């Protein structure tokens, strides 16, 4: 008898629960295990070398405990920083979540794309490579939102978020900068 595939979904907080929901719809027979590194949240503020070490340590413990057939990283920050290292370090397959720059470049009508992400994801070489490879013909407005992930966690936990705080975090990516405004915005938190 074949056993059900065991998939570990990992994120720094509750944001990856949307990944679990999508996986549940596509793979209803899979055993899904969700792990959030809330002790390390938010990842966007960490120094890169320290964050890679933390992710490796946490992932080693999770893989030993869960013994997954596959790991899905539901965090753009962790994926853009540590996905290659995780794939080298562990035998289990890893699937990352990275900013959806390729589909955004295909969908834009104005040629202007906004990327709303953590400061780390915005400045990462991985993100720049995605832009260079898939959106070279577009104007890409990057905005590293300092507090967006934290505001999302508060809301996901049932808390209240002041709309003014949210607007302050997201409005820079919607501002017109020397031409047409972004008609497609990518979320990369």
Residue ranges of each PLM-predicted region?
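Non-catalytic structural scaffold of enzyme domains
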Residues: 1-188
């Amino acid at each position: 008898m074949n056993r059900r595939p065991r998939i570990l979904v990992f994120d720094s907080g509750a944001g990856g629960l949307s990944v679990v929901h999508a996986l549940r719809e596509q793979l209803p027979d899979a055993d899904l295990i969700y792990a959030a590194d809330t002790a390390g949240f938010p990842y966007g503020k960490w120094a890169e070398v320290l964050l890679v070490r933390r992710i490796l340590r946490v992932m080693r413990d999770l893989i030993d405990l869960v013994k997954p057939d596959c790991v899905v990283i539901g965090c753009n920050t962790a994926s853009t920083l540590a996905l290659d290292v995780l794939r080298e370090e562990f035998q289990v397959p890893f699937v990352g979540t990275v900013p959806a720059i390729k589909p955004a470049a295909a969908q834009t009508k104005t040629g202007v794309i906004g990327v709303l992400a953590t400061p780390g994801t915005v400045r990462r070489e991985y993100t720049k490579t995605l832009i260079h490879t898939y959106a070279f013909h577009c104007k890409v407005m990057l905005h590293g939102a300092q507090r967006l992930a934290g505001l999302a966690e508060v809301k996901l936990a049932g808390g209240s978020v002041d709309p003014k705080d949210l607007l302050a975090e997201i409005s820079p990516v919607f501002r017109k900068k020397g031409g047409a405004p972004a008609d497609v915005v990518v979320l990369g938190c």
